[in-house]
């Protein structure tokens, strides 16, 4: 299906000023984006989105916001990187039950985000978002 690529291409062809004007369409006094505002905005921007397209796009925005909030919660120092120190004290049920040590659980958690080319014991926001975006497809 080439429709999503064509829509993305149309957005990009509008340049920065087009994207800025699209952003203005979504701003109201609540500083939140409703599904109705998104639908109206993409229509005014000249994009032909079906209701299903708008629903999918809105759902993707909501998922990303939830993942970003989870990362922010884990990043205790606010430096944009989750380390063992950040997640100490966030106990798994296995630790509480004595089935695993805190260190084992922390290592297992961090290893979920490591690639064969990058084993540093840290999780960046990009790694966190990439991991969870892959799970929700």
UniProtKB/Swiss-Prot annotation:
Keyword Calcium set for record: yes
Domain EF-hand: 27-48, 62-97, 100-135
Disulfide bonds: none
Keyword hit for Repeat: yes
Main function: Possibly acts as a regulatory protein and not as a calcium buffer or transport protein.
Subunit field text: Monomer or disulfide-linked dimers.
Comment field (misc): This protein binds calcium.
Name assigned to this protein: Crustacean calcium-binding protein 23
Source organism: Homarus americanus
Lineage of producing organism: Eukaryota, Metazoa, Ecdysozoa, Arthropoda, Crustacea
